[in-house]
UniProtKB/Swiss-Prot annotation:
Tissue-level expression: Expressed in airway epithelial cells.
Repeat as UniProt keyword: yes
Protein name: EF-hand domain-containing family member B
Keywords on record: Calcium, Calcium transport, Cell projection, Cilium, Cytoplasm, Cytoskeleton, Flagellum, Ion transport, Metal-binding, Repeat, Transport
Main location: cytoplasm
Matches recorded under PROSITE patterns: EF_HAND_1, EF_HAND_2
Residue span(s) of domain EF-hand: 561-596, 597-632
Residues that hold Ca(2+) 1 according to the record: D574, D578, M580, E585
Amino acid sequence: MNMEIGHPHEGKDDLGDKRVIMGTKFPMELGIRVGLGKEDSRCGESPVVSNKCEGRMAPPETKFPLSKGLEMGLERQNISRTVMQRGSLGVDSVSASQGTKPSLLPGRMGLENESLLAGYTHERIIQPPLGRVCGSSQAAGSRRAPLASGPEGVEELVGKPAFVMEPRQEMEKESTCVLMKPNTEIKLPVEVDIGLTQAEGPDETKNTEPQMGLVIEPPQCQFAQQHEQRKEAGNIESGVEPPDRIRPIYSGKFFDRTPCWPSAGKVIPVGYRVATCLTEKLPRLITPPEAKKYFNFRYPPAGVERVFYGRANDPQIAPYLTHGIRSKISVLANTLINPQPITTFQQKIKDKKESIYLSNRRAPLGKSHDQAPGLPKGMDTTNTTFGTAVIKEYSAKDVVNPPKSYEEVFKEGNEGHDLYVVSHNDYYAGEAKNRKYNPSSFHRCSVYGVPTPHFNDGRAMAKSLYWLHELQMKRGAKFVSKRADDFKEKFQHKLGRVLDPIAETMNVPPDCTFGACLRPEEYGVGDLIHNRLPDEYLRGKDRQRALIAAVRHHLKKVNYQKFDTLLAAFRHYDKKGDGMIDKDELQEACDQANLSLDDKLLDQLFDYCDVDNDGFINYLEFANFLNWKDKMLLKEYEERVIIKGRKPDCVNPTEANVEEPEQTLLIKPEDIVLKEAGSTEKTLRTLLRPSDKVSNYYKTTSSEINAIVGAIPSTCYPICGVPTIRSDIPAPRIRRISDRTNYGEEGSAYSLLYPTIFARKGVFERDFFKTRSKEEIAEILCNIGVKLSDEEFENVWNLASKKHHRGEVCVENIRNVLDELRHADRIKCKTLM
């Protein structure tokens, strides 16, 4: 089918005038074209008919009004054919589209709205059309990519199925066609880039006759939509695009030939960035009062009462209610604290009113009691003295701290005590009251009744330190949560037990032990260190050793409290007087000391004290194991005590013929040692048990560090480290507050616990080393009771002044000189004797 679309030369004059057809409808043409524009479909054509699409796609974000749409339509597309030919073309296109298969590419859909068919007449290309605007809203706002024109483009469309076209009658009724006769003055666009390949013909530039185009007015719904979109655009702030208007990702850079295909990636609206989200929009939106009460009920502000939204608008009566009786305003507090000053006249009137009270006359405010009204008239109150004159004998200082020694004060205090007991009941602390009973039948030191139970372990004192309810709480049952008890039983460690979290799942008794039981060794670490024999192992004998230690401690305490010397204690134990203590005598002594020992414990005690294993406890063993020999020193007469021989037993005739042994000393001379090196006090040597002899070869680190007695002093060799007391540097005269260095002039913990007599009297080190004159030194010696003649004082002063390079004398120098002179006199007296 060969069809030439265009205007013949004969028809130009008929169409010269511009005609406007209002309400003219071409059912076949408009229906097909509007329907194709709405459904985004394209009609197929025959190979003879060619389409030349020269349309430019408008940007999706730009929406033009009606006038701009018509102008752009004229510039974009031109229709160069008559109305009747268009009608016939529409019929042909419909028939051609119906004959094709129903399948088109998405990119080809809707091309009919933006492209026009251009006929070829014997290889002559007709002049490009002027333009057309479609009245469909979808056609105006849709984005379509232009297709390539020419033979290739036409051939590709032949045989392809066409999209099913459903013309809409509503859009046909609303659309309006305007036929315009183009004027020769209208200038065509110089260059329009539509993205399609255009065929260039030699006769294309020759055909410059103006053609008539068909303009289809857009429907009214498009104008309403554009008005709403303008309103929405006005509400959005400047610089931010609405989120529903998304531009292509290639806009401005590339030409999207397939805009209907989804683009890869996520397109973020332009303008919604982090800075925009973090920027507060002011002024803020105001919540309506109707919704505010619900918000305040659910989220009340800080410090505001939560009010139910049902009574949010109720009248507020409670804040203005007043309960009780309204009190009247009294005098203000500032008036009471700082009253207004009164005048002199008002003060005199006030004093006159107050003078009638007895308290004002006896104890007036701010002055003493005026006794003149009660005295006889004419008495000289200034020179008259009442009472008896007191003779001044002693000052309060002498009464509190008399200038006497302690012995004199104590002796004077005891004088007349018996008289004060009768007159004033002045008893000493703990002194019993003497009721003066008949001494023939009663002795004041006698004790009657049952002895009070007494325990040395302090159980009675421990009981008295607790309140009764505390003791009852200890004896009472303690309630513990079963959940907490189960948790502690399962997860907390217990002393002497291995942690077993799965113990509850094991069906074994609590005392079950897995694995082979190891037999404990007979010896311990201490036995290995001291190299003890098997019969002397101490492992497993802790209870036995503890009992023996307790018995020995009790006997030591009794001996120390009851006897003054070791010899007196030994004679108390030695009932037979043979210088030895046997087991029976030890049993009797323990009974007298309120110690009831069984035979086994007595044997263990006796074996412990009997070092030489002779069956008796001698004086040396008694002093080492049953006494505190360091506190009960040896007297001189104890060294000369002689042991008498034992008398023979007359029952045994063999012992009767034995001669009596020679008399020996109770203490051997080699058993007597000095208590300390250089001391005159003597004590007995320390006995070592056979198992303890090995310990002499072992020395601890602390004993080696502290064993400096008699060694080279530390001043003879350098010492590393900084000393605790910095005696190596002089103390500053004025010390800083932050200086915590001990220069040796400060007291130690011992001086705080046991202060000297000087510290008790408030005399410190600086007072001893302060330089003083001769008169001040003489006065100090006289006040402390040191009586020296003038010659002796001069001698002491001269010796003390020689100890300083500048001849200065202090109290410490005088004290040292007096000690030296006294020591020299003592030595002189001993030499003369």
